[in-house]
Amino acid sequence: MSTNPKPQRKKPNVTPTVAHRTSSSRVAVRSLVEFTCCRAGALDWVCARRGRLPSGRNLEVDVSLSPRHVGPRAGPGLSPGTLGPSMAMRVAGGRDGSCLPVALGLAGAPQTPGVGRAIWVRSSIPLRAASPTSWGTYRSSAPLLEALPGPWRMASGFWKTA
């Protein structure tokens, strides 16, 4: 018997394509923003707005990326809407017909005027990632806090207030 190891097939070096890099960075940004929203009180619900992907595709048109739409009275706990894997934008405040920050986390919270611009959708982040006990493990989302408008910041001192 030979003690030499069997020759292994050499795997070709595969460099990630632009599409791979774009989608992975989009997922990372989405997760950080979702987590910031969750820390503001939404838990497994976030208020989402359709927008353009970095590639220029419009989420309204691209069926594979669009979430199912929710009725105007739906909100956390009532919405049948689900979040597609590549939702590009999250609403950072209660402006321009978006979901009200004060309504986050309330069962049956109504959508604000401007139906169709912003909808309640389930977050793709596991519920346990949004729990208060895990907040300290997601410090990488800190730069996003500065970009959030006043209503999203908690007055407890955990986040800066306006």
Curated annotation (Swiss-Prot):
Show the coiled coil region(s).
none
Task: Please cite one Gene Ontology biological process associated with this protein.
Answer: viral translational frameshifting
Q: Name one GO cellular component term.
A: host cell perinuclear region of cytoplasm
Q: What is its main location?
A: host cell
Q: Name one GO molecular function term.
A: small GTPase binding
Alphabetical list of InterPro entries matching this protein = HCV_core_N
User: Is the Transmembrane keyword given for this protein?
Assistant: no
Quick one: where's region Disordered?
1-23
Per UniProt, the ranges with Polar residues bias are 14-23
Q: Does the keyword Oxidoreductase apply?
A: no
What is the annotated localization of this protein? Host cytoplasm; Host cytoplasm, Host perinuclear region
Recite the other comments: This protein is very unstable.
General function of this protein: Contributes to the RIGI-mediated inhibition of type I interferon production.
In its UniProt entry, what is this protein called?
Answer: F protein
Species lineage, top-down? Viruses, Riboviria, Orthornavirae, Kitrinoviricota, Flasuviricetes
